Amino acid sequence: FNRHVILRANATPADMADWMNEAHAVCEQCEHFIPVAAASNSRNENGELVFGMNDAGGVLATWPGTLGIAAAVKGYRIDLVDKFAATVRREWNACGLRKGYMYMADTMTDPRWQRTYGTFGEDPALISEIMTHIIPGIQGSAQGVTADGVAVTTKHFPGGGARENGFDPQYAAGQWTVYATPGSLETYHLPPFAAAVKAGTA
């Protein structure tokens, strides 16, 4: 019995909660009650549904895409991220989703990269500040995941946004990292991930 699943369906919050309750009921009948851990990619930004990219469109509270959130933070203030994270934690917890493959700490240094839409942009200091707020905000604490928190798996890895010809690093064509200047890895790509680790990313 598989207890670790990723939810891709664009189900309503009520349907997600019902499905999770039924899955846990099955687990309770097993010899060792090990609950189901349902994960998902992010669901609270950008209303356009794209399978494997944005797994839900308009089902939960819909905020701007991550680039829009970064722009709003840059032009407004960081507590916008705190409000966003609290919304995500509250809605996901109500649906029974306890793990998120989100958010991207990748620094976008090649505009050809097809995953730029999921980043917080090209400024490592801004991305780091967002990571410092968004992770504990969703997980419920800077010390880890609380009872009502959602575990955050930060994506993807340092240098992921600097691939040759903008190819995605999840595929063979994107296996080569191109750093335009000496020290690019340390200057642009490592700081947001260091901030995510310090913020307690799961």
Residue ranges and their predicted role:
Residues 1-202:
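Glycoside hydrolase catalytic-domain context in secreted enzymes
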